[in-house]
Amino acid sequence: MSPSATDNSDGPDATVLTLRKVLTSESEPLARRFRALFSLKYLACQQPATEKTLPAIQAIAAAFTSPSALLKHELAYCLGQTRNPESVPYLQEVVKDTEQDTMCRHEAAEALGALGYEDSLEILKVLRDNKDEPDVIRETCDIAVDRILWENSEQRKAEKLKASDFTSIDPAPPLPMATSEPSIPDIEKRLLDTSLPLFQRYRAMFALRDLASPPDLPTATHAVEALAKGLKDPSALFRHEIAFVFGQLSHPASIPSLTEALSDQNEVGMVRHEAAEALGSLGDCEGVEDTLKKFLNDPEQVVRDSVIVALDMAEYEKNGEIEYALVPDSGVAAA
């Protein structure tokens, strides 16, 4: 079961308790709760673990009772980045709970894939094969199963992967390094080939991401343009991941396609919200803040919430703050 907001069975820690209270309080502004979450994520992701690691994981999991789908999906993402088996039971509980928001359950499934533990395979396979589950859940579980199998395979040990600028644990690794110069058209073809398994298409996606960073790389703009074509894919899950990758890249060439996705009232919420947050990472670019403000009263709650967080992130980008976090003391920063 998820720990309560006040549960502190592993002993008091002033930093974690302060952050936990902010994160789990429905009276706190959403942007402040997100900053608290990213501070807790930093503590939860410490390698090797510290005395604050488990309490930080418990603090993150305590907020799964929130009514905010946006916050809960971010909790699941953060737990998936911890590389810690203590996160697994909380995520398994969420992914099995059909009363939870679909976006949150999807993120929990993806997080289980990121953690890579084989004891999650059974529940992921059951959900993948259940035709009564929403497509986004089945597709996410399909990718997560493939990722766990890859993580624990001899194939992984044999593959040579390009060093990435990104420290995130992704839903799929990039494609193995080619013996020749990487061809963006070839990778794009793989990205857009709907006959391929989603896991393989995701590998192409993250290969293109790595060819787009840093932004002054000769391949960067072409890689972003190739990724942008994925925003027209029939899979909402795939489209949302493209938007997430654009948020990581913060490349100005992605602004037109992200703006189009956010502005499309016929697009699903999980894609539009991801587009909003990605635009938030580009908040110092001309016109982005004005675009985001147009959606502060959007009919969809998750889009409205994302715009609030995105504008807070944009402010952080403009102000040149060191970390997007809530810092109770000098020992905490956001990962």
From Swiss-Prot:
Annotated cofactor note: Binds 2 Fe(2+) ions per subunit.
Enzyme class at the top of the EC tree: oxidoreductase
GO molecular function, one term: metal ion binding
One GO location term (cellular component): cytoplasm
Main location: cytoplasm
Binding site for Fe cation 2: H240, E241, H273, E274
Function text: Catalyzes the hydroxylation of the N(6)-(4-aminobutyl)-L-lysine intermediate to form hypusine, an essential post-translational modification only found in mature eIF-5A factor.
The keyword Ribosomal protein is annotated on this UniProt entry: no
Keywords of this entry: Cytoplasm, Hypusine biosynthesis, Iron, Metal-binding, Monooxygenase, Nucleus, Oxidoreductase, Repeat
Binding site for Fe cation 1: H73, E74, H106, E107
SUPFAM superfamilies found in the cross-reference section: ARM repeat
Catalyzed reactions: [eIF5A protein]-deoxyhypusine + AH2 + O2 = [eIF5A protein]-hypusine + A + H2O
Cofactor(s) recorded in Swiss-Prot or TrEMBL: Fe(2+)
The name this protein goes by in its record: Deoxyhypusine hydroxylase
Pfam entry (one): HEAT_2
InterPro entries with a match to the protein in the record: ARM-like (IPR011989), ARM-type_fold (IPR016024), Deoxyhypusine_hydroxylase (IPR027517), HEAT_type_2 (IPR021133), PBS_lyase_HEAT (IPR004155)
Record localization: Cytoplasm; Nucleus
HAMAP family in the record: Deoxyhypusine_hydroxylase
Pathway: Protein modification; eIF5A hypusination
Domain of life per record: Eukaryota
EC number(s) from the headed UniProt entry: 1.14.99.29
Chain positions of HEAT-like PBS-type repeats: 71-97, 104-130, 200-233, 238-264, 271-298
Sections of the chain in a coiled coil: none
